[in-house]
Amino acid sequence: MGRAHEVRAASMAKTAAKKSAANGRASKEIYMAAKAGGSDPSSNLALRALIDKAKSNQIPKEVIDRAIKRATGGDAENYVSNRYEGMGPGNTAIIVDALTSNVNRAAANIREVFNKNHGNPEGKVAFMFEEVSMFAFKGKTEEEVLEQLMMSEVDVNDVEVEEDMIIVTAPYKSFNAVKHSLDELGIEEYLMSEIKLIPIDDYIEVSDAELKQQLQTLLDKLDELEDVQNVYHNATI
């Protein structure tokens, strides 16, 4: 299976609860990056990447600006990142990344969602995923992108063309180098520009209608939690 579904999943229409959660997680990420490296995206590459990611996820400009203003205004709020693993309906593997000011609250809420929605928060599944840099955009040919990346001598795993999109996958450590090379090529708008987890093996096809609905509900409930930043899984639903 290609990577176009990764981009589609990230850009799907969200419920009001999901939109609120998405705004909150973008705000926290941008706040932490600006607080650590300064408010200028031209010199703070981590902040620039998160702003690009927020824009591709249709986060309102005022949310981005407010997070940066908080970081530069002496706000002392701090967040801790944690990763949680579990199993979902259909023997699917799920990883949840949280960024929270209250670790106990985050852990309890994530565990509760698993337990109440046919999941198991005790599963160990991290070994089933790998961390990669992923970029998706339109407006360039595969040949143009390959030539640019080769000229830049950056480490890339794959370049695919799917549904009029160019999708570039690279080692997570190559994110800044690949992003810089693509920017030089003239890419101004990214459908995806982030470091994420993807399954090492093929995605699991969940064909049973009841299991599929149970899994979708579990993923939706996790995604709506205030402290959850990302939810990764190895299922096609």
Swiss-Prot record:
Mention any one GO cellular component term assigned to this protein in its UniProt record: cytosol
Keyword Transcription regulation present in the record's keywords: the answer is yes
Chain residue ranges for the region called Disordered: 1-20
Please name the GO terms that the record assigns under molecular function: DNA binding
| Location of the protein in the cell | Cytoplasm
- Report what the protein is called: Probable transcriptional regulatory protein Mfl546
One of the Pfam families matching this protein, by short name: TACO1_YebC_N
Q: Which UniProt keywords apply?
A: Cytoplasm, DNA-binding, Transcription, Transcription regulation
Similarity comment: Belongs to the TACO1 family.
Q: Which organism is it from?
A: Mesoplasma florum (strain ATCC 33453 / NBRC 100688 / NCTC 11704 / L1)
**Chief localization class?**
cytoplasm
Against InterPro entries, the record matches this protein to: Integrase-like_N (IPR017856), TACO1_YebC-like_2nd/3rd_dom (IPR048300), TACO1_YebC_N (IPR049083), Transcrip_reg_TACO1-like (IPR002876), Transcrip_reg_TACO1-like_dom3 (IPR026564), YebC-like (IPR029072)
Q: What biological-process terms (Gene Ontology) are attached?
A: regulation of DNA-templated transcription
Superkingdom of this protein's organism: Bacteria
The record's section on Gene3D superfamilies has: 1.10.10.200, 3.30.70.980
